[in-house]
Structure formats: C-alpha cells, structure tokens
C-alpha cells in the first residue's frame, strides 16, 4: 500500500526537477547578457545636442543576443554607433549590436558607443544618467552612467 503512494510521489518529484533544470538552462542561454564594466559618459560643452555613453556588455549565455534599442531620459533618442574610418576620415554609423555567446561588446572612445541625440540638458561632470538597454533575448537592462570630464578616456574613479 505504501509503495503505491511513494512511487507516484517520487515520479512527480523527478519530473518536476527535470522541468526546473530544463527551464534554468533555457534562461541561462537567453538571459546571459551582463554589464561587465562601469558605464560612463563624457561631459558635454555648453550648447551640445549630442553625447556618448560607454560600457562593456558581455554575453555569458549560450545563445547570441542583440541590443535592439537604447533609451535615456537624458536625450530625445539614443542608438548604438560605431566609429569607422573611410578614406582617412572618421565617421559614425549605427551598428546592429549583435553579441555572440562568450563574446563582449566593448564601448570606448573612438569605437562603439551609445550616441545620445537631442540632449535634454548638458551632461555635467559628476552627474549620473540612466540608460536602458533593450536586448532581443535578455530584455531590458538599466545602467547608471557616471559623467566624467570633457575628453576623459575612462570612467570616473
């Protein structure tokens, strides 16, 4: 009699455990994107309408992910840009934001960056601005970027 009760209970527990492990593996593959370094921005001169934010994003999951959009209350719009050189001239262009599993997207001056367009006010040294990154699989992630001085090469210490 006890065996008739114990076997179905053990079977139910085993199936539940298997389902949880499967869910955990899927979650790891889909939401493995993390911010790997401190987000920072450069201060802007008076009257500037654009600014830049830099951060390193690592994909620690098992599937590729892509940064779909960026938004910030500090600007009317924001997008992921990269700096390229064509015929000896540096130009910026929008980029797709794809991050392969195990790879990282390192944003830094002269390279990839988040371009803030239509600033709502100047980016002042010492301030902090909020930036929301929307990933295809990992969803939304909000980071706070500390504003460094004009011409800074890295985050505020």
Language-model-derived ranges and their functions:
Residues 1-5:
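Positively charged n-region of N-terminal signal peptides that target proteins for export
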Residues 10-22:
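Bacterial N-terminal signal peptides
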Residues 25-157:
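Compact, glycine-rich, soluble single-domain proteins
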């Amino acid at each position: 009699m006890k065996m008739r009760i114990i076997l179905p209970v053990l079977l139910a527990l085993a199936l539940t455990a298997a389902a949880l492990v499967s869910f955990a593996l899927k979650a790891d593959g889909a939401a493995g994107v993390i911010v790997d370094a401190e987000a920072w921005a450069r201060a802007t001169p008076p009257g500037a309408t654009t600014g830049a934010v830099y951060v390193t994003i690592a994909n620690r999951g098992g599937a590729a992910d892509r940064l779909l959009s960026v938004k910030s209350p500090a600007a009317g719009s924001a997008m992921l840009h990269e700096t390229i050189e064509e015929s000896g001239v540096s130009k910026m262009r929008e980029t797709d934001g794809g991050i392969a599993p195990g790879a990282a997207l390192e944003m830094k001056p002269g390279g990839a960056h988040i371009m803030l367009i239509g600033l709502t006010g100047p980016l002042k040294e010492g301030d902090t601005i909020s930036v929301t990154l929307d990933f295809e699989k990992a969803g939304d992630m909000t980071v706070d970027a500390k504003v460094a001085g004009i011409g800074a090469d890295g985050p505020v210490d």
